[in-house]
Amino acid sequence: MEYAYSLSTYYDDELVAVMRLHDFMEAHDAWAKCVDYGNAKVYARYNLTDPTGKMYTKTFYANGEVVIK
């Protein structure tokens, strides 16, 4: 089975998880759950890649700063 979306989670530049998702709604639900810096010491970065290769990024810093690209 082929996956259309990929959600990667990094804590302080270390890859800690990769999810492969089949459809938009599944990817959207997983992306919506990325809401804080988790177990990272400095920051957590979440990358969602769609079927066209476009990447969306959320970065949550321990100091409360949030950057979404």
Predicted segments, located by residue:
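A short, charged, amphipathic alpha-helix used as a generic interaction element across diverse proteins
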Residues: A17, L21-Y43
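Intrinsically disordered, low-complexity regulatory regions of eukaryotic regulatory proteins
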Residues: Y10-D12, L21, N63
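Short aromatic-glycine-(Arg/Gly/Cys) micro-motifs in beta-strand/loop hairpins
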Residues: M1-L15
